[in-house]
From Swiss-Prot:
<dbReference type="InterPro" id="IPR006121">
    <property type="entry name" value="HMA_dom"/>
</dbReference>
<keyword id="KW-0479">Metal-binding</keyword>
<feature type="binding site">
    <location>
        <position position="7"/>
    </location>
    <ligand>
        <name>a metal cation</name>
    </ligand>
</feature>
<keyword id="KW-0636">Prenylation</keyword>
<protein>
    <recommendedName>
        <fullName>Heavy metal-associated isoprenylated plant protein 29</fullName>
    </recommendedName>
</protein>
<feature type="modified residue" description="Cysteine methyl ester">
    <location>
        <position position="138"/>
    </location>
</feature>
<feature type="lipid moiety-binding region" description="S-farnesyl cysteine">
    <location>
        <position position="138"/>
    </location>
</feature>
<feature type="propeptide" description="Removed in mature form">
    <location>
        <begin position="139"/>
        <end position="141"/>
    </location>
</feature>
<feature type="domain" description="HMA">
    <location>
        <begin position="1"/>
        <end position="59"/>
    </location>
</feature>
<keyword id="KW-0449">Lipoprotein</keyword>
<dbReference type="InterPro" id="IPR036163">
    <property type="entry name" value="HMA_dom_sf"/>
</dbReference>
<keyword id="KW-0488">Methylation</keyword>
<comment type="function">
    <text>Heavy-metal-binding protein.</text>
</comment>
<dbReference type="Pfam" id="PF00403">
    <property type="entry name" value="HMA"/>
</dbReference>
<dbReference type="GO" id="GO:0046872">
    <property type="term" value="F:metal ion binding"/>
</dbReference>
<comment type="similarity">
    <text>Belongs to the HIPP family.</text>
</comment>
<feature type="binding site">
    <location>
        <position position="10"/>
    </location>
    <ligand>
        <name>a metal cation</name>
    </ligand>
</feature>
Length: 141
C-alpha cells in the first residue's frame, strides 16, 4: 500500500494497528518510498480500512513495480487468466462496475506502474514559430 507517513510515530501507529489484525503475519514499512507491505491471509479490504482509519488519510494500493525485473509479469498473468474479453456496455458506452476508490485503486493504473510522460508532445520549433527574433515568423504579426 502507498501510505503517507511523516514521522516515526506515524510508522509505529500503522505498524501496531496492522499487526493486531487477525491473519497478518508480517508488516514491512519503507518510509522513504511511503510503502507498507503486509503478508498474511488477511483480506485486502480490511487491511485498507484499518490503515485508513489509523492515518485518517487517503491510502491506495501500490501501483508501481516492486523490482524492475518484474516488468511484464502483469501481461503474462492476464493473458493466462483472462483469455476471453468481457464486454460491459450500455448503449455502446463502456461501464465500470468496480468501485476502485473503495477498494484502494486511484487513477487509471490499477496495479500497473506509471508510464513516463511522452517527451515529444511539443515540437521545439513550435515555441519559436511566433517569436519576433525568428526571421520567418508569421506574417500576420
Amino acid at each position: 500500500m502507498e501510505v503517507p507517513m511523516d514521522c516515526p510515530g506515524c510508522e509505529n501507529k500503522v505498524r501496531k494497528a496492522l499487526e493486531k489484525m487477525n491473519g497478518v503475519h508480517d508488516v514491512q514499512i519503507d518510509i522513504k518510498q511511503q510503502r507498507v507491505t503486509v503478508t498474511g491471509s488477511a483480506e485486502q479490504k480490511k487491511v485498507l480500512k484499518v490503515a485508513r482509519n489509523v492515518t485518517k488519510r487517503d491510502i491506495c494500493l501500490w501501483s508501481y513495480p516492486y523490482h524492475p525485473e518484474s516488468n511484464g509479469y502483469n501481461d503474462r498473468y492476464f493473458k493466462k487468466k483472462f483469455r476471453k474479453r468481457i464486454n460491459m456496455s450500455v448503449n455502446g458506452e463502456k461501464v465500470s462496475s468496480y468501485n476502485y476508490h473503495k477498494h484502494g485503486y486511484h487513477g487509471h493504473e490499477h496495479g500497473y506502474y506509471q508510464e513516463r510522460p511522452y517527451s515529444g508532445l511539443i515540437n521545439p520549433s513550435a515555441s519559436s514559430m511566433f517569436s519576433e527574433e525568428n526571421p520567418h515568423f508569421c506574417s500576420i504579426m
